[in-house]
Design a protein with these regions (language model features):
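Cap/insert and terminal regions of metallo-dependent hydrolase folds
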Residues: 106, 110-113, 184-268
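Beta-strand-turn-beta hairpins that frame and shape the catalytic cleft
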Residues: 26-31, 44-50, 130-139, 170-176, ...
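Divalent metal-coordination and catalytic microenvironments
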Residues: 43, 53, 84, 91, ...
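Short gly/ser/thr-rich secondary-structure transition/capping motifs
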Residues: 32-35, 59-67, 89, 121-122, ...
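Catalytic core of the metallo-beta-lactamase
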Residues: 36, 40, 132-193, 211
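Active-site HxH/HxHxD metal-binding segment of metal-dependent hydrolases
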Residues: 68-131, 139-147
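Metal-dependent catalytic neighborhoods of phosphoester/phosphodiester hydrolases
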Residues: 91-101, 117, 236-246, 270-271
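Pre-active-site segment of Zn-dependent metallo-hydrolases
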Residues: 16-25, 40-85, 92-97, 147-158, ...
């Protein structure tokens, strides 16, 4: 596994960002995944481009890693996929900038409503529902992340299970599962085998937790685990952001399949 750099406070830190430009959005053979930092990704599947939860500007906490591209530099997108409303996933500043070059925004109904309030072309979906973006078929998978109901400061409404999701993407070159922020759910252990997982391993009570990450990884023992939701926010005492790949490697079966990307670094999807 890649040597993990450390912040002065000892927090595991993402490798140095690898900036990219318009070339990452061009027609190509195959499917590539680029981590955008945080819980964001750019997926280019034979020229069809999607971003999941892009936070490219406007975040309100200090960062350990720069975004590999600014929102205003994105030449085009076929779709943006949003898993839930937290501002480290649904960046209003980023989405406003992407709106003019994006074919559409897809999210659970509640989040799509928030995006529509910004004037964005947003479509809401049921959990388990699907839609097509070019050759990519996307399906919303369940997530358990209604943490606001336990925080009077943040409970602006009764948050529902269906307000959050993951995304399962079937591409011509294999399947990608962006699990999303979620406590471990039994149904997440019974999915078809994905060819790659965008894997949150935050040891937080409203995330997968290390025990949950161990179980989820064991359910799909050969699937490459592209780590995200770690190493980018300067918050050494916040479990939501301070995951350590070296700790995860000591907990899971077949740790050699852990993929530690630098933000912006391309990774090629292959069928298992």
């Amino acid at each position: 596994m890649t040597v993990i750099p450390r912040s002065p406070q000892g927090q595991a830190q993402a490798p140095r960002t690898q900036p990219f430009g318009a070339e990452a959005f061009a027609p190509q053979q195959g499917t590539t995944i680029r981590w955008l930092g945080g819980a964001g990704a750019l997926i280019n599947s034979r020229g069809t481009t999607l971003m999941t939860d892009p936070v490219l500007e406007g975040f309100d906490m200090p960062l350990l890693a720069d975004a590999p591209i600014r929102a205003g530099e994105v030449p085009r997108l076929d779709a943006v996929l949003l898993t839930h409303c937290d501002n480290d996933h649904f960046s209003r500043d980023t989405c406003r900038r992407l709106g003019p070059v994006c074919g559409g925004f897809h999210a659970p109904h509640y989040v799509a409503g928030l995006a529509a309030e910004l004037g964005l072309p947003a479509t809401g979906h049921d959990i388990g529902g699907g839609f097509d973006v070019g050759p990519v078929h996307a399906k919303l998978t369940p997530a358990d992340h209604a943490w606001q109901n336990q925080s009077p400061k943040h409970k602006t409404r009764e948050f529902l299970m269906e307000d959050s999701c993951g995304f399962w993407l079937d591409t011509p070159d294999g399947s990608i599962w962006a699990v999303g922020d979620s406590r471990l759910m039994p149904c997440q252990l019974e999915m078809p085998r994905p060819d790659a997982m965008l894997f949150d391993f935050s040891d937080s009570s409203w995330h997968i937790g290390l025990d949950g990450a161990e179980k989820l990884a064991a359910a799909y023992p050969d699937t490459p685990l592209i780590l995200w939701h770690w190493g980018c926010v300067d918050a050494p005492k916040m479990k939501e952001f301070n995951g350590d790949p070296e700790v995860l490697a000591g907990r899971i079966v077949n740790p050699e399949r852990i993929v530690v990307l630098a933000p912006g670094q391309p990774w090629t999807l292959r069928r298992l």
